[in-house]
Amino acid sequence: MRVVMLGYQTWGHRTLQALLDSDHEVVLVVTHPKSEHAYEKIWDDNVAELAEKHDVPVLLRNRPDDDELLAAVADARPDIIVANNWRTWLPPELFDLPPHGTLNIHDSLLPSYAGFSPIIWALLNGEERVGVTAHRMNTELDAGDVLVQRSVPVGPTDTATDLFHRTVDLIAPIVRESLDLIASGRDAGQWVAQDRARASFFHKRSAEDGRIDWSWPAERLERLVRAQSDPYPNAYAFHRGQRLRIVSAAVSQGCYGGTPGRIFIREGDGVVVVAGAESWSGRSRGLLVRRVRTDDGTEYAATDWFRTMGGYLTSRP
């Protein structure tokens, strides 16, 4: 089949590479210009460079709705459009243009976690599995019928970085399987409508989303630290007015009472910070902070940074 690919960052790069390695012909690539957004500067393998290396025409767009782009896609005569990590809405005159429409590759187990940063949100919410879905694009974002879906388990110490690597490796086989089904006509009867009653949709992550709220239970704070693992912007709080990024943490073994954010006691290789809206009861676990990092990039063992107990980690300076 003749394929037009729309994609960005490593997700789009993996998709394009899978298409180039297949029996299908990539006739045009559309990708976004480079961005200074923190979450778009990581996992930033360049789609345009890969396309140009293989002599595939490339168009750069923030939004794919101008007449020049629509004409270029029509002139390419695609049988299908394949999209992955396209960051803006696609109009129907584009996604319905090819005979087989548009196949979107999304890194969640749809209908859950449509939208942005699905792996981070899923980890934060304690999901047991994450994955990748190939679905038909329609007028509602990430809501079309599903053709192929694959998942991987979330381990108790997995970080968002671990899960990124595990799920990005699912892209190529999912792209190959989906296109082979469509090209051969074996996709008939295989498309499954999403259960919209189970759907959830999430916004882009920003610096505010990494700010620690010490009224959260320690279990959720520990997942936040893992969800904001390097190279993502780390979860952070403030100590004596200075921002402190929490690089490594766990849930404390003991239960500790007091005011959320109190730097309380050493436990094992870390320092326990009181956490949870019910911490006044003395029955809540604390967040065992193991490693911290200052804004200049210097990393410390928590036991070295917090030389004495007492004082507070706060949400604001």
Task: List each model region and its residues.
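N-terminal Rossmann-like dinucleotide-binding module
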Residues: M1-I42
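Internal alpha/beta domain cores that form substrate/cofactor-binding pockets in large enzymes
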Residues: R2-V4, E25-V30, H37, H54-A76, ...
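A residue-level signal for conserved active-site and pocket-lining positions in enzyme catalytic cores
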Residues: G7, V29, A51, I81, ...
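Short beta->alpha connector loops
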Residues: Y8-W11, N62-D65, W86-T88, S229, ...
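Structural motif corresponding to alpha-helix initiation and N-cap regions
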Residues: H13, K41-D44, D66-L70, T88, ...
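Donor/substrate-binding cores of folate-linked one-carbon enzymes
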Residues: S22, I80-F201
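Acyl-group handling in specialized metabolite and lipid biosynthesis
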Residues: H203-W216
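An anion-binding loop in the catalytic cleft
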Residues: D213-P317
